[in-house]
Amino acid sequence: EPTEIEMRVASNVAALIPDGATIQLGVGGLPVAVCRALKGHKELGVHSGVISDVVADLIEQGVVTNARKGIDAGRTVTGGLFGSRRLMDFADGNDAVEMRSSEYTHNQQVLARVQNLYAINSGVEVDLTGHVNSEVAGGRERDTFSVA
């Protein structure tokens, strides 16, 4: 579950994402919190390496329609499902969810064709040159997976 601080940050991030945007989601509490904060948005798209239950919620609520993505119209494109049995059942046989390899979901030429793409990820630290570390803290790998 996202923390109270993550929910406040998520509210600010969601305010920066316009209706009709396509989102890419990382893993962890912050991307989950941002998805929850997006429930008032309209006609969002999803093109992401992985999705969790909150994306299924947004599709069911009509927030994610994938109508304005520029490519893969009408379909949430993802390389993996990370969530509950409900998510697996939701995606199984669902034409609105398209499973693709990372060669597609992370391909620069494909990503360049996605309209109005916003990447939502969390990080552990950022250095002075702008490089983001999202996996290691204090010499130890962080558990970055959070399912909601």
What are these regions (language model features)?
Residues 1-148:
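Conserved alpha/beta enzyme-core scaffold
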